[in-house]
From Swiss-Prot:
It comes from Legionella pneumophila (strain Corby). This is 23S rRNA (uracil(1939)-C(5))-methyltransferase RlmD. It is an enzyme of class 2 (transferase). HAMAP family: 23SrRNA_methyltr_RlmD. One of its GO terms (molecular function) is 4 iron, 4 sulfur cluster binding. Keywords: 4Fe-4S, Iron, Iron-sulfur, Metal-binding, Methyltransferase, rRNA processing, S-adenosyl-L-methionine, Transferase.
Length: 444
């Protein structure tokens, strides 16, 4: 029998917010049922309207704030209410950190079934103009005869929020969004550009135009003139990721760069490579990870999900040898390139399936005293399940998803005999609910 959808009550409701969800939405309890309301803060009394009725929870749209929280601040971005790029600009920066730290510790307790012996002080950076990588959507609107450039709408990802600025983006692109829009508006084929990837190094900013059809000579000229006037490297992507090429300057090498000044290391990377979006926080994160590793000259370290060597190369300056393993062959090539350009010789890199620890062991027949793990959001489940075959005395786990960190912590602590010494958050993404964290495990 077909289920009948519950009818929405469209009259406004009033409720007090009692908590925050993992994604930063306010939680109200209405007749014992959780209602999630974007933009509401704990302690506030809000007026809202139901937008979705589910079996176990409801969702609502914030209409007004009857009793505001002292933690509430005015969002800096004029597009904040619609844009899906940020979710916490209405909360003070200090409270954002407390929310993320509390969320991490709650997950470690609930799903990791343990608590750290100590909690690290949060790592923070500048809250604005920190983001060095982003993807801007573009769409030419026939009715308006103008181009929209922006991020997806928070409540309807099918649509684009047209923006004139973005205060979390690298300061250069923040001020040039309006010029990007004007560029596309003047092109002969205004439907050609589907999206624009932004990637910034320490000294240069690159734009990758995803062109759905070949550019006309006139449009190529306009892009060159734009790049020259506003000082961008421009890449074109006419097909898949392997089709990206440097379009302007035509004689330029394809790499951007960033530096870890404390270690006198400079990394070169392609705009499509994975790099941390927040350069200032990344520098602090690398230093904290190395401090937690407590490296000795005799240590041989395994760096899993090593990427282009962001942790491997600075660690190599403090130990006997580092072996980096990465699933992406292109990143392994980049890691070797960076080791060579920085004259670091006590590192080796391998491409392997990181869900198969035995494949890693067969590639690298070495004993490791310490391991650093920096996995994607899916975590490192297969690695921690097979950690006995590596048997390190110390593990530093850098996480971009506290839920999978908590899951993997449960295995390490309650099945593999490790102790969670310390853990804490790193605010890689201010004004969003994304939680980056770091944890130290010691063999019990």
């Amino acid at each position: 029998m077909r289920k009948v959808k519950p009818k929405l009550n469209l009259t406004s409701q009033t409720a007090r917010i009692v908590n925050l969800s993992h994604d930063g939405r306010g939680i109200a309890r209405v007749n014992g049922k959780a209602t999630f309301i974007q933009g509401a803060l704990p302690g506030e009394v809000v007026e809202f309207q139901y937008t979705r009725i589910k079996k176990d929870f409801d969702e609502g749209k914030l209409l007004s704030i009857v009793e505001p929280s002292t933690l509430r601040v005015e969002p800096k971005c004029p597009h904040y209410q619609m844009c899906g790029g940020c979710s916490l600009q209405h909360m003070s920066a200090e409270e954002q950190i407390r929310f993320k730290q509390s969320h991490l510790l709650d997950l470690l307790s609930r799903y990791g079934h343990t608590e750290p012996q100590s909690v690290l002080s949060p790592l923070t950076s500048h809250h604005w103009n920190y983001r060095n990588k982003a993807r801007l959507s573009t769409r030419f609107v026939e009715k308006k005869q103008s181009t929209m450039v922006g991020f997806r709408e928070r409540n309807n990802p099918r649509f684009i929020t047209e923006i004139n600025q973005c205060p979390i983006l690298n300061s250069k692109i923040d001020t040039d969004i309006v010029h990007l829009r004007k560029l596309i508006d003047t092109m002969e084929d205004k439907h050609c550009i589907a999206q624009i990837e932004v990637a910034a190094g320490d000294n240069e900013v690159a734009l990758i135009f995803r062109n759905l059809s070949p550019l006309t000579e006139q449009d190529e000229l306009k892009i060159r003139e734009f790049a020259q006037q506003f000082q961008y490297k421009v890449f074109l992507q006419p097909g898949g990721l392997d089709s990206v090429f440097c379009f302007y300057p035509s004689d330029a090498h394809a790499y951007l760069s960033y530096e870890l000044p404390d270690y006198q290391i400079t990394f070169q990377f392609h705009p499509n490579d994975f790099t941390q979006v927040n350069a200032e926080l990344n520098r602090k994160m690398v230093t904290q990870a190395i401090q937690l590793m407590e490296l000795k000259n005799s240590d041989i370290v395994l760096d899993l999900f090593c990427g282009l060597g962001n942790f491997s190369l600075p660690m190599a300056k403090h130990c006997s040898r580092v072996i980096g393993v990465e699933g992406n062959k292109n990143m392994v090539e980049r890691a070797y390139m960076n080791a060579k350009s920085n004259h670091i010789t006590n590192v080796d890199f391998y491409a392997a399936n990181l869900d198969d620890v035995m494949e890693v062991r067969n590639l690298v027949n070495t004993s490791f005293s310490k391991v650093l793990i920096d996995p994607p959001r899916s975590g490192a489940l297969e690695i921690v399940k097979q950690i006995d075959s590596i048997d390190p005395e110390r593990i530093v786990y850098v996480s971009c998803n506290p839920i999978t960190l908590a899951r993997d912590t449960d295995i390490l602590v309650n099945q593999k005999g490790y102790v969670l010494i310390t853990a804490g958050v790193m605010d890689m993404f201010p004004h969003t609910a994304h939680v980056e964290s770091i944890a130290l495990f010691q063999k019990g």
